[in-house]
Amino acid sequence: LSAYPAILKEITNEGEKMAHELETQNGVASFASFREPAWHGLGTVFTEEKTTKEMLDLANLSNWNVRLEDLETPSHLTSDKNYQYVLRTNPTDNTQTDILGVVGERYHVMQNEDLFSFGDNILDGGGRWETAGSIKGGRVVFGALALERETILDPNGVADKVKTYLLINTSHDGSIAIQASITPVRVVCANTLNLALNTTKKKNGVKQSFK
């Protein structure tokens, strides 16, 4: 935790050198942020508290209708396993269907709406939505709720106050399960998501993704 401000400063000051990996389609970035624009300058910045549904809408995470479709094995091949495409309705063009990944038969779909309700329920509706977004072409989604408490770094020195967040994230390609973490990192891109997950000592997960 003590190294967090220096690491975050490096990310924000040198962000132009790193890929944010936010999903962007038709000039629209799937990202929303409360009051503060992120270093990449993408997405929607809002100034008033939003409901869970409103947050999903702002970040282009609503109505994906994530679903499975059987992947047929070519007739000249044999396999004792069944695989499926993970599909979604494109968030900016509902006439288009996107492939998010290929998973095994034990994979269970989670809608973005269910992920965000999961986070909302952890705090019993007591948090405020801070950021939300989609990265890696929709394969990974995240949301962060601001908590009331603050962490004080170096209380006998500079006494910096660092906000904390409840981070929720999952994948739609079977790469990671549903996770909930408490972190001082304000997640706005792939880099800050990785930083939050790598510096969080304890993560609560729901085993959802099976290849």
Language-model-detected regions and their locations in the chain:
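Short, positively charged and aromatic/hydrophobic N-terminal segments
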Residues: 4-9
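Feature for intrinsically disordered/low-complexity regulatory segments and propeptides
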Residues: 11-118
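Intrinsic disorder/low-complexity polar-acidic segments
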Residues: 113, 117-211
